[in-house]
Amino acid sequence: MAKMIAFDEEARRGLERGMNRLADAVKVTLGPKGRNVVLANKFGLPTITNDGVSIAREIELENSYERIGAELVKEVAKKTNDVAGDGTTTATILAQALVREGLRNVAAGANPLGLKKGIEVAVERVSEELSKQAKEVETKEQIASTASISAGDSAIGGLIAEALDKVGKEGVVTVEESNTFGLELELTEGMRFDKGYISPYFVTDADRQEAVLDDPYILIVNSKIAAVKDLLPLLEKVMQTSKPLVIISEDVEGEALATLVVNKIRGTFKSVAVKAPGFGDRRKAILGDIAILTGGQVISEDVGLKLESTSLDLLGRARKIVVTKDETTVVEGSGDPDQIAGRVSQIRNEIDKSDSDYDREKLQERLAKLAGGVAVIKVGAATEVELKEKKHRIEDAVSNAKAAVEEGIVAGGGVALLQASITAFEKLDLSGDEATGANIVRLALEAPIKQIAFNSGLEGGVVVDKVRNLPTGHGLNAATGEYVDLIATGIIDPAKVTRSALQNAASIAGLFLTTEAVVANTPEYAEADAANVDAAMRSQGF
């Protein structure tokens, strides 16, 4: 495959053009008066959004060098979204400002490596200053404020604050589409996992299509159950207590399932069988969590326990279990609080030691189900386009609120970055190109507040000069045009989001500045690749 190669200024300027085209599309969304961007979908309705990373993902440029530049900036938005869940537009604007100022200095003869070093030192100092400025989230109102700013809607912010208040720091907040109009918050006490009843014959509430069992025994098995003779001794013991039975296992099939269903239909014995969530080692771990939460044991031959010899004291208990076709909720398990606390501590240690983002996410879910709870925000809207846009905003706002709880809050509206730079640069002792690199950061930190001002119809330079002379935490309320105490007014950003945006932008800027050559596909090969992808998708029926 033939390639094109560009060197020096030509290479860097090609990358910069791609970055500018992407950043210019993203930055119009920043601030309370930011605009939306409409994204065309090849299949289905267009999407309307103000989310930086969603816009960035959709941008594909024709020019090969520009495409690479855009991809590098996409990485800034994606990384910030992965780490903090929000702040993608701010990260993109910072990256653009750092690269623009940096390339200007490289063209004037500055050493790119010296500039990169100066940028890294300055960003580290500003990040430290942001951490010092951060105030711990103490009230539900502060969570509501930060979520409201992210979502652009105070009703959404209030609902998210209520959800986090109910489930706690470790809890799970999920967003689901609803057939009804408006917003609804559904709270779950205890543990919920994504597996429902094996057979609809287990349903006890026909209207709601749920199996609701009060004060049941819970049998937790790390294998399939097929032979009724293995299960019969335990069934007889449970029937003598007149309590219902919940079976959570890899699967229940054959005559064992038939026996349970027949007894349920006849009214002889109430039970429900549920498939265990997860696969392999993760399934074992989740079954262990359920056992500890309910005060039972996992019946497994690995630990010398056989189903046919299982006694009642090896079964778990809960106040109530609700099973739908898709999920199971365990309410108020009877586990020992000390054992649950020990399990929570163990999972936290595993999270700290894990190198995999996927493993960390799954461990976090397990932790939330044990230590917190589950809140589901159900979203409804008049049209599918509006529904998707609203759901996306709420998901961003949930991430934003969680980040605020994690590392605290700073003044919003781009003010925290600007004011952190004033203090950070007082103590900076650099010279030559490193000092120039630090100055590039100082100028770039003005970019977010200037863009917010511009999107609000104000002059950015005037706003920056005014904010520089205000007390820490005071700045422009772009929604009203007034200069106020931003934290007191509820115009706040999570420190984690602001810090991540700056650090990721600086990382990519350093790569831009130290690039001396770009190797790219020739246009005809790029078009052929795109055509091949289209043909492959058509052949699959897309």
UniProtKB/Swiss-Prot annotation:
A Pfam family the protein falls into: Cpn60_TCP1
Q: What is this protein called?
A: Chaperonin GroEL 3
UniProt keywords, alphabetically: ATP-binding, Chaperone, Cytoplasm, Isomerase, Nucleotide-binding
CC annotations in GO: cytoplasm
Subcellular location per the Swiss-Prot or TrEMBL entry? Cytoplasm
Q: Is-annotated flag, keyword Cytoplasm?
A: yes
Q: Is Isomerase one of the keywords UniProt gives this record?
A: yes
Please name the InterPro entries in this protein's record: Chaperonin_Cpn60_CS, Cpn60/GroEL, Cpn60/GroEL/TCP-1, GroEL-like_apical_dom_sf, GROEL-like_equatorial_sf, TCP-1-like_intermed_sf
Q: What is its EC number?
A: 5.6.1.7
> What high-level taxonomic lineage is stated for the organism?
Bacteria, Bacillati, Actinomycetota, Actinomycetes, Frankiales
From which organism does this entry originate? Answer: Frankia alni (strain DSM 45986 / CECT 9034 / ACN14a)
The entry assigns this protein to a family as follows: Belongs to the chaperonin (HSP60) family.
For binding ATP, which residues are annotated in this chain's numbering?
T29, L30, G31, P32, D86, G87, T88, T89, T90, G413, N477, A478, A479, D493
Describe the function of this protein. Together with its co-chaperonin GroES, plays an essential role in assisting protein folding. The GroEL-GroES system forms a nano-cage that allows encapsulation of the non-native substrate proteins and provides a physical environment optimized to promote and accelerate protein folding.
Identify the CDD domains for this entry.
GroEL
Q: Set out the biological process GO terms recorded for this chain's protein.
A: protein refolding
Quaternary context: Forms a cylinder of 14 subunits composed of two heptameric rings stacked back-to-back. Interacts with the co-chaperonin GroES.
Name the NCBIfam families for this protein. Answer: GroEL, PRK00013.1, PRK12849.1, PRK12850.1, PRK12851.1
A GO molecular-function descriptor: unfolded protein binding
Among HAMAP family, the record links this protein to: CH60
Q: Which reaction does this chain catalyze?
A: ATP + H2O + a folded polypeptide = ADP + phosphate + an unfolded polypeptide
PROSITE patterns in the record? CHAPERONINS_CPN60 (PS00296)
